[in-house]
Every structure is written in C-alpha cells, then in structure tokens.
Amino acid sequence: MSRQLAKRWITVDEYERMGEAGIFHPDDRLELLEGEIYKMSPIGSPHAACVKFLSAQLNRLFNGKLIVSTQDPIRLNDFSEPQPDVALLRWRDDFYKYSHPTPEDVLLVIEVADSTVESDRSYKIPLYAKAGITESWLVNLPEEQIELFATPADGAYQIIKTFKRGDEAQSHTINDLSISVSDVLG
C-alpha cells in the first residue's frame, strides 16, 4: 500500500515564534508565503536605489497622513506574511507596534523587481489580490515600466495598467498619488 506524503504548512504565528527562538540565521532574508518559507533574492544597487527613492517620495507626499512601510511584514492571513518593498498604510499613532498590518490597513503595495519579475507578477501580485489589497504596483526594472494592479475580485485584479518611462504613474485608488516613471527608474 503506498502512502501519500502530506505537506504541513507553517502558520504566521509559528513562523514568528521560530524567529524569536533564533531558528533562522540573523542575516537570512525570508518570507512566509502560503505556509512555506522562501528565501528572498539579494537586493542589488538599482533595486535598493528605487526602493529608497519611492520611500522618500511617498514620505514627502503623505507625511503625517499615511505610513510608508519599507520591507516590513504584512500579515495577509494565517499562512502568509510577505515583506513588500514598499507599502502605504493607514495612519496609526502606534505605528503598528502591537501587530503587523493586515490587508485592511494596506492602501498600496509596491514590489520592485529585477531578477524576480515573473515570480512577483505570477505569484506575489495574485497573493495580494486574494488577500483583498486594493492596489499593487510592480516596478519592473528590466522592462523599465510600472505595472499597476487594482480592484481585486475573485482572487484576481480586475484593472491592469502599464506605465512606461515618460509617463506619470497615477494610482487607481489614492487620489494624490502620481509619480514620474522616469524618476522612479532613475
């Protein structure tokens, strides 16, 4: 009689306890996605510069109105806690000291991708849609464009737009957010 192997997914609570217990190396860059732990790709200079630029611009635009979160965890559900490059969060005076933001707190997620474009587009962006995050951007460094995904329904984004160098990327859900694609790409 053959026996099927069964996967056992890790919950966010278990993952966080593992981190607190020192199971992971301090230099490990990890994400929990759908119950599985993934090693994050190294961050190159163009990627890092883009994240810094976005963070600075968004802080300038929304200072005191929204929280700009950079490479911090978001608890999507009991089995996923990604660390998007940038996220715009609803303002909270405690700055989420007692719990990570959840989808209801997130107005926009931005993933910056160089070597991870396909996996971010086909795996992480749909994960954000399934969680109900209203808008996600993929800054596609190789193709020099920003891909906007908005209005999640039935686990997928209904609106998809592409902004090229020379365009202004205009948020679909945040009225005051418009940013030069050329400036973002550097």
What are these language model-derived features?
Residues M1-G186:
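Gly/Pro/Ser/Thr-rich low-complexity, intrinsically disordered segments predominantly at protein N-termini
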